[in-house]
UniProtKB/Swiss-Prot annotation:
The active site is at residues 339, 436. Transmembrane segments: none annotated. This is Cobyric acid synthase. Keywords: Cobalamin biosynthesis, Glutamine amidotransferase. CDD domains: CobQ_N, GATase1_CobQ. One of its GO terms (molecular function) is catalytic activity. NCBIfam families: cobQ (TIGR00313), PRK00784.1 (NF001989). Catalyzes amidations at positions B, D, E, and G on adenosylcobyrinic A,C-diamide. NH(2) groups are provided by glutamine, and one molecule of ATP is hydrogenolyzed for each amidation. One of its GO terms (biological process) is cobalamin biosynthetic process. Belongs to the CobB/CobQ family. CobQ subfamily.
Length: 505
């Protein structure tokens, strides 16, 4: 049966928990609809994450929405994630509205700000609904968080405001899937329960015949269909929204010697997707090293980006990394600093306005001769140019409040369209840059691996891995979900009728 979608047809995906599979399911649905010839866009009203992406217009959105835009064949846009919260402390976040920071807020102040945030959410959604045939919306966390229900703009508060149907997804791999689904329904209001039109069970591995009695019970108990059961997709690569993947894929038997790369898992690490290309490269053994673990020997040490650079630098020192880095350099190892990690390499970091914590200054590691001052206006841009190493092509994006200056910058790491950027030490052992996504460009990745000591790096393109991941999820969505029901929900014809789940009579 073919479907015609009205402009702005909307379906929302909510989850019983964080990491239930909302982002992945939205990505798969977006690609499936795009393949069917529909003009579709992703939307997440509110996101809390330190992994972000820069749009071509110079705005900031959650990384997951940038991947979902790719699934739709679109460039990312700030309307796809109008509210982004970037935690800089346990009880405070930088609030980004339609791509641009409006200030730091604690939970109480943000609660008071929510009506303004909701206005931005509805404004962005209205623009997407006007431009596209379909909008696939991703919720945040769980809709059943009792303490967050008042003034909710991320889950049912949004669904009720725009009057859209909802599918509820739960992760069976972590256990308790039926309790999660039934319990979530029990904690919703009557109108919210009615809005949930079906369930998706995610990450199933096993015998469907053993699961089927549970599905039948769930449908009888709730009166709602199981729209489908998605399998656990081993080895799937999609950019993580916030969870840090700590190490590389296991090496294949008989594989070449691998370059050893380590990075501290900073408490406020940001944009750790920078490391995905290293984590997935077949010749790289990459590991994040957490609290309490001494830094092991490595060929390359990378200091990641941070949302609280001075606080993370203090943590780095307390964890013994400063001495370990100096020993690493003394024995000929390479050191790379990315964004906040680059700032740590200098002589000092100044935060006179208290943008990332109490106002003040902190001494840097003193490995490069420059200083950084954090300023109110954040630098947001996509960039391209060449890496000084081998003249390799480089592209990526910048997200930082720091402005750096000093003699070390006279020997840059990159030459970008807008000018020289970053720093390379006189002895060539230390490289620092503000460019995120540095390893995503195959030429730059190859040059950096060779610089770090890998004689013959294989060409590797993480962007192709991402595209394959999107296609895998879309194929699973098409094969395992009741797409007829989903299309009915989008077109409006299925809002009040019952439907059989995928694979069910």
């Amino acid at each position: 049966m073919s479907h015609r979608l009205p402009r702005g047809a909307t379906l929302m995906i909510q989850g019983t928990t964080s990491d239930a599979g909302k982002s992945t399911l939205v990505t798969g649905l977006c690609r499936a609809l795009h393949r069917r010839g529909f003009r579709v866009a992703p939307f997440k009203p509110q996101n809390m994450a330190l992994n972000s992406a820069v749009t071509p217009q110079g705005g900031e959105i959650g990384r997951a929405q940038a991947v979902q835009a790719q699934a739709c064949g679109l460039p990312p846009h700030t309307d796809m994630n109008p509210v982004l919260l970037k935690p800089y402390a346990d009880q405070g976040s930088q609030v980004i509205i339609q791509g641009h920071a409006v200030g730091n807020m604690d939970a109480r102040r943000y609660h008071e700000f929510k009506p303004t945030a909701l206005s931005a959410v509805l404004e962005s959604y209205a623009r997407l609904a006007h431009q596209f045939q379909a909008v696939i919306v991703e919720g945040a966390g769980s809709p059943a968080e009792i303490n967050l229900r008042t003034g909710d703009i991320a889950n049912m508060g949004f669904a009720e405001a725009v009057d859209c149907p909802v599918l509820l997804v739960a992760d069976i791999d972590r256990g308790g899937v039926f309790a999660h689904l039934v319990g979530t329904l029990e904690l919703l209001s009557a109108s919210e329960r009615e809005r949930i039109r079906g369930f998706v069970i995610n990450r199933f591995r096993g015998d469907m015949d053993l699961l089927r009695p549970g599905i039948e019970w769930l449908q009888r108990r709730t009166g709602k269909p199981v729209v489908g059961v998605l399998p656990h997709l081993d080895g799937l690569y999609l950019d993580a929204e916030d969870a840090v993947v700590t190490k590389s894929r296991p090496a294949a038997p008989g594989q070449d010697t691998r370059l050893k790369v380590i990075a501290p898992r900073l408490p406020r690490i940001s944009n750790h997707t920078d490391f995905d290309a290293l984590r997935l490269h077949p010749q790289v053994d990459f590991r994040f090293i957490g609290t309490g673990a001494p830094p092991p020997p490595a060929d390359l040490v990378i200091l990641p980006g941070s949302k609280s650079v001075r606080a993370d630098l203090a943590w780095l020192r307390e964890a013994g990394w400063e001495g370990a880095i100096r020993r690493h350099l003394r024995y000929g190892g390479k050191l790379l600093g990315l964004c906040g990690g680059f700032q740590m390499l200098g002589q000092a970091i100044h935060d006179p306005a208290g943008l990332e914590g109490p106002p003040g200054s902190s001494p840097g590691l003193g490995l490069l001769d420059f200083e950084t001052t954090l300023e109110l206006e954040k630098q947001l841009r996509t960039v391209s140019g060449i890496l000084i190493l081998e003249g390799a092509t480089v592209s990526g994006y910048e997200i930082h409040a720091g402005v750096s200056s000093g003699p070390a910058l006279e020997r840059p790491a990159c030459r970008l369209e807008r000018g020289a950027e970053g720093a390379l030490s006189d002895d060539g052992q230390i490289l620092g840059t503000y460019v995120h996504g540095l390893f995503d460009e195959p030429e730059a990745l190859t040059a950096l691996l060779r610089w770090a000591g890998l004689p013959q790096p294989r060409v590797f393109d993480v962007r192709l891995e991402r595209e394959r991941g999107i296609d895998r999820v879309a194929a699973a969505v098409e094969a395992e979900l009741n797409m007829e029901l989903i299309m009915d929900l989008l077109s409006g014809s299925g809002r009040r009728e019952g439907h059989a789940p995928a694979g069910q009579p």
